[in-house]
């Protein structure tokens, strides 16, 4: 299944989550798209709730279903902690997610593009794979020739606060995943237990 490239605002309103991270999609019309979006929503089934929760998280991180499920299955092999929480943490360890959390990009999509285009280094070596799993202590930096490109500079200037599990030297544009995030530091609007139930239901 290919990555969704359609209108993000429409998907945001349908799922009730801001895919851009700005919240603008929901500020005007917080209901689902369509002629009857503002009306009373039909009650959805338990399976429907599980599917919607899975789609919310998948679209938030911009992954294909294949990428999403592969990481979900990998997280299930981690012995410590719960499957759902480990999955959420694994999503945050993706290089594009770390670049986004460091404030080197304003959206995860932009962070993915920076990685794809070779602007990002890990421990001094170029890594152009967005799904690369960053480990605590690894140094994530911007390539010297890329430090002055406008999107990165604009992103740095727009940062209000960074999560405590990452750290960035704004002069060197060099940072790291200080530690793995705690569940309470991640998206509170996601019920990962429903996602686990969804995949368990599929078998």
From Swiss-Prot:
SUPFAM superfamilies: Alpha-L RNA-binding motif
CC terms in the record's Gene Ontology section: small ribosomal subunit
Subunit and interaction comment: Part of the 30S ribosomal subunit. Contacts protein S5. The interaction surface between S4 and S5 is involved in control of translational fidelity.
Signal peptide: none
Domain of life: Bacteria
Protein name (Swiss-Prot/TrEMBL): Small ribosomal subunit protein uS4
Family listed: Belongs to the universal ribosomal protein uS4 family.
GO molecular function: rRNA binding; structural constituent of ribosome
Species of provenance: Leuconostoc mesenteroides subsp. mesenteroides (strain ATCC 8293 / DSM 20343 / BCRC 11652 / CCM 1803 / JCM 6124 / NCDO 523 / NBRC 100496 / NCIMB 8023 / NCTC 12954 / NRRL B-1118 / 37Y)
Pfam families linked: Ribosomal_S4, S4
Tagged with keyword Chloroplast: no
Purpose: One of the primary rRNA binding proteins, it binds directly to 16S rRNA where it nucleates assembly of the body of the 30S subunit.
Gene3D superfamilies listed in its UniProt record: Ribosomal Protein S4 Delta 41, Chain A, domain 1 (1.10.1050.10), RNA-binding S4 domain (3.10.290.10)
Keywords: Ribonucleoprotein, Ribosomal protein, RNA-binding, rRNA-binding
Domain S4 RNA-binding: 93-153
GO BP of this protein: ribosomal small subunit biogenesis; translation
InterPro entries the record matches: Ribosomal_uS4 (IPR022801), Ribosomal_uS4_bac-type (IPR005709), Ribosomal_uS4_CS (IPR018079), Ribosomal_uS4_N (IPR001912), S4_RNA-bd (IPR002942), S4_RNA-bd_sf (IPR036986)
